[in-house]
Amino acid sequence: HQYRAEVVRMKPTYFIEMTDTFGGEANYCWVNRFLVSASSPRGAMRRAAKHTGFNVRNVGCDRWDAVGACVCYFVEWVDPADIQSYRDKYSRIEVI
C-alpha cells in the first residue's frame, strides 16, 4: 500500500478558472479559481464540474463549457514548483 500512496502524491496539479460567458466568449464578470489534483486535464475537469454542480463538455483545447448555462472553464497544467505562486497570486483559490 505504500506504493499506492506514492502514486497518489505524484498526480499532476491543474489550474482551473470558471467564469461567465457573454455572446459565447469568456466574460470574467466573475471568476472562481481552483487547483485540482488529477491524472489528466479531463479528470481535473470531472472533479471541478462535480464540485461546482455543472455538466460540462470540451469545446476544444483547454476550454470546457457548462451544458445549459453561460459558464465556461479553462484548464492548464501547473508545474509543482509554481503551485505556491498560484496560491499567492490569487486570494480566493480553492484546492480540490
Predicted ranges, named:
Residues 1-9:
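Short, Lys/Arg-enriched N-terminal segments with co-localized hydrophobic residues
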Residues 44-49:
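Short amphipathic, charge-patterned alpha-helical segments
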Residues 19-21, 39-41, 78-80:
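Generic structural motif
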Residues 27-41:
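A short, exposed loop/beta-hairpin motif centered on an aromatic-Gly-Thr core
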Residues 53-96:
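Short, mixed-charge low-complexity intrinsically disordered segments
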Residues 9-31:
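Short aromatic-glycine-(Arg/Gly/Cys) micro-motifs in beta-strand/loop hairpins
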